[in-house]
A protein has these predicted regions:
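A membrane-cytosol interface segment of integral membrane proteins
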Residues: 108-149
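Phosphoinositide-dependent membrane-docking surfaces
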Residues: 85-104
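Short hydrophobic/aromatic-rich beta-strand segments that constitute the beta-sheet cores
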Residues: 73-77, 97, 107
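Alpha-helical transmembrane segments
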Residues: 23-27, 48-53
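Short, exposed beta-strand/loop patches in secreted or surface proteins that constitute
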Residues: 64-68, 96-99, 110-112
Length: 149
């Protein structure tokens, strides 16, 4: 299995946020320092794109890296601009079933080290479609009879 990684897509969003921040700084410098006599409608042009980013605040991007490991796969996730990383080992011995979630996540019921069932959500909304299908296929290979609970 090829590694599943969405680093490129999330990095494009990160640099778009950086560019937008520089755009806002430039508009404020231009309006208040270079040409204070310009109309205030220019400030509206600086803040209009923020409404395009509103959906991304709700659906904040995460880095997802899934690699094949012995008898299963290792899934690492990390939020954008965060240092904390979460790892999840999915094997045929601990993967019990799926549970129903929204269209942004895959819900997995996994056994922990004390043999207690835990629910884990994997955010897949920032994956490309072919990577999402590869992840689902690998989960199907690990446990082809996993029911939806």
């Amino acid at each position: 299995m090829k590694d599943i990684n969405n680093k490129g897509k999330v990095n494009r969003f990160k640099f778009l946020l950086y560019f937008y921040g520089l755009f806002i700084v430039f508009i404020f410098v231009y309006k208040f320092l270079i040409a204070p006599d310009t109309p205030s409608i220019l400030l509206l042009a600086a803040f209009a794109p923020i409404f395009g980013f509103m959906s991304s605040i709700v659906n904040w991007p995460i880095y997802l890296h899934a690699v094949e490991a012995e008898d299963g796969m290792l899934i690492n996730t990390r939020k954008l601009f965060s240092k904390k990383q979460h790892s999840l080992m999915v094997t045929k011995y601990n993967f019990d079933s799926y549970y129903e979630t929204d269209h942004l996540h895959i819900g997995l019921n996994l056994l922990d080290k004390d043999d207690k069932m835990q629910q884990h959500k994997i955010k897949v909304s920032w994956l490309r479609l072919k990577d999402l299908r590869a992840l689902e296929e690998k989960l199907r290979d690990i446990n082809p009879y996993a029911p939806m609970k």
